[in-house]
Amino acid sequence: MKIGPVVSLALLFGLGITPLAQAQVSTPLFIAADMVRGPGGSGPGCVLSNQFMRKEEVAWRIRVQDATGKELDEKGLKSVVVEMSDGQKFPARFGGHPPKAPTAYIWSTAWVIPADYPTGSFNYKVVATALDGTTTTWEPINTKPTLLTIVAGTFEPPAK
């Protein structure tokens, strides 16, 4: 008769630990990202592009979803950062776009290419950090036509 209470106790103990272990498993994230020309560039703003001149603004638009497809905002993630192959990091912010009359709420960040930045193709990645500290990384396909490309020339905005 002593086996019954021992088995019951072991079963209850096991059931109590199982949910704890499941709670520690991180949820996979899905990242979708693109690059567009920032406002005031050599072409229309917010249009997909991967070729930019120096002094132009590169803008990244990013969506992060959990395993159920739910969009994650600043309350659902610790951070979203674009990391360049040269080590530069650009933290993204969550907000409405376009700013004056939002039609989408996304993560975004931008970078004005320095006048002395080298030309060529450069890899980058997007790193999303979940609230539990786990990270998910997205990178574009590693072929020159899809990478950030700095072309010869320097953009000079028109005088106002």
Model-derived regions: residue spans:
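Bacterial N-terminal signal peptides
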Residues: 8-16
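Short beta-strand elements
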Residues: 132-160
